[in-house]
UniProtKB/Swiss-Prot annotation:
Keyword terms of this UniProt record: FAD, Flavoprotein, Membrane, Mitochondrion, Mitochondrion outer membrane, Monooxygenase, NADP, Oxidoreductase, Pyridine nucleotide biosynthesis
Organism: Saccharomyces cerevisiae (strain ATCC 204508 / S288c) (Baker's yeast)
Protein name, UniProt field: Kynurenine 3-monooxygenase
Cofactor requirements of the protein: FAD
Listed SUPFAM superfamilies: FAD/NAD(P)-binding domain (SSF51905)
EC number per UniProt: 1.14.13.9
Molecular-function GO terms, alphabetical: FAD binding; flavin adenine dinucleotide binding; kynurenine 3-monooxygenase activity; NAD(P)H oxidase H2O2-forming activity
Family matches, as InterPro entries: FAD-bd (IPR002938), FAD/NAD-bd_sf (IPR036188), Kynurenine_monooxygenase (IPR027545)
Subcellular location: Mitochondrion outer membrane
Pathway assignment: Cofactor biosynthesis; NAD(+) biosynthesis; quinolinate from L-kynurenine: step 1/3
Length: 460
């Protein structure tokens, strides 16, 4: 008889985990406290969704689980070969991601989530929406899951499973129940930032330029870096762009005291968007849409001994979105877990234990990198010194091949290099670049001093 598993959370990682385990013959039930997002009656489906950038780690994970489904699911993604930096005068500068035409890919979160749910409908997975996890009783036999169901989520309901997988996000109920069973180290950190979803509608005005109903180049991730705040935009397949404003809590609270203040702020700081974004709609969104917080979560261990439960995705390692790796990392979690189960011939206890032991260093690394990258996106991309270092980084990579790989390439385009290994290699490379930078500046200073002395002697 096949083992039964309850997967808590029908977001992106939960759906992929359900697909992976159903492919391996497990009896899978996927739960979510929300209603089915594919239904027209489901409210507030995408008011707080930062568009996704899926790259090598996420794509490779999808391919490893179901190559045919991967091709279908990702058919609407739009390749982005670099960042497009917009300055205060409306000028644009392209900064390519890769050395050989590599690209990350824009895809709408809701479209991807719904596509995964559609794939699950074709499998043996049972989908149960409107089920809120309340409690788990841990036993040596079955894990007893208590839910609250119904429209008001107040009717009690109980099911038993061989094991549980928590994919229920940063505020994971599964993790809370695991903390009652195991001694779990846990940390939660909020960044002093909030984000608001904005929208750039499709238009036919620039169709000759971009080959579609896009107002700006779809093959770039657009960034309006303003040091203490920024705006980004990623293309959707219908020609629209999902745009997101990031700013401090105090700044946003001060702005939204009046519509006129928001309007003036947008016109002053993002002058080139007023021709492509409905300004009235943007002001309305600033005032009425959720001002969502950004939280980082780290914990360890990720499992309950005996193979009773494991955490994947944001439930284990919520991160800020500035490296575009949250979903990619969560998908990679699933791929690595399935590989470990195969390695241990389905022995959950051994596979889950090894997952915690080997994965933790990588997850801490990418969570930290994501935090660091906000400064790069909002400030460094306008720095000549930063851009010079990036060019040197690329030059050394061309000369030295695989012996020198830029950090972004290792993270976004090389799923064969772990996050922790990428961070370690990049640290060594950065130290070399800084040394060469200091050496060059020192030589220029000495040269300048000698030239000055020579010229002053000539005059005397």
């Amino acid at each position: 008889m096949s083992e039964s598993v309850a997967i808590i959370g029908a977001g992106l990682v939960g759906c992929l985990a359900a697909l992976a385990f159903s492919k391996e013959g497990y009896n899978v039930t996927l739960y979510d406290f929300r209603q089915d997002p594919r239904l027209d009656t489901t409210k507030n489906k995408n008011l707080k969704s930062i568009n996704l950038a899926i790259s090598a780690r996420g794509i490779d994970a999808l391919k490893s689980i179901d190559p045919d489904a991967c091709e279908h699911i990702l058919q609407d993604m739009i390749p982005m070969k670099g960042r497009m930096i917009h300055d205060l005068k409306g000028r644009q500068e392209s900064q390519l991601y890769g050395l050989h035409g590599e690209a990350i890919n824009s895809i709408n979160r809701s479209v991807l989530n719904n596509s995964l749910l559609d794939e699950l409908e074709k499998s043996t997975t049972e989908l149960k929406f409107g089920h809120k996890l309340v409690k788990i009783e841990w036993t040596d036999d079955k894990q007893i899951c208590h839910f609250a169901i119904g429209e008001d989520l107040k009717t009690p309901h109980t099911e038993k499973y061989d094991f549980v997988i928590g994919c229920d996000g940063a505020y994971s109920a599964t993790r809370s129940q695991m903390q009652r069973k195991v001694e779990m180290d846990f940390s939660q950190e909020y960044m002093n930032l909030r984000y608001i979803e904005l929208y750039i509608p499709p238009t036919e005005e620039f169709k000759p330029n971009y080959g579609g109903n896009f107002a700006i180049a779809p093959d770039h991730l657009h960034i309006w870096p303003r040091h203490k705040f920024m705006l980004i935009a990623l293309a959707n397949s219908d020609g629209s762009f999902t745009s997101t404003f990031f700013g401090s809590k105090d700044q946003i609270s001060d702005l939204i005291t009046s519509k006129s203040r928001v309007r003036e702020f947008l016109i002053e700081n993002f002058p080139d968007i007023i021709n492509i974004m409905d300004l009235d709609d943007a002001v309305k969104r600033f005032i009425t849409y959720p001002k969502e917080s950004l939280v980082c979560v780290n914990c360890k261990p990720y499992d309950v001994p005996g193979g009773k439960a494991i955490l994947l995705g944001d439930a284990a390692h919520a991160m800020v979105p500035f490296y575009g790796q949250g979903m990619n990392c969560g998908f990679e979690d699933v791929r690595i877990l399935m590989a470990l189960l195969k390695k241990h011939s389905g022995d959950r206890s051994r596979a889950f234990t090894e997952y915690t032991q080997t994965r933790h260093k990588d997850l801490v690394s990418i969570t930290e990198l994501a935090k660091r990258n906000y400064k790069e996106m909002s400030h460094d991309v306008t720095s000549k010194r930063f851009l010079l270092r990036k060019k040197l980084d690329a030059l050394f990579s061309i000369i030295m091949k695989d012996k020198w790989i830029p950090l972004y390439t290792m993270i976004s385009f090389r799923s064969d290099i772990s996050y922790s290994r990428a961070l370690e290699r990049a640290g060594k490379q950065t130290r070399i670049l800084k040394f060469l930078e200091s050496l060059t500046l020192g030589m220029l200073s000495i040269g300048g001093y000698k030239l000055f002395k020579f010229l002053t002697r000539e005059r005397s």
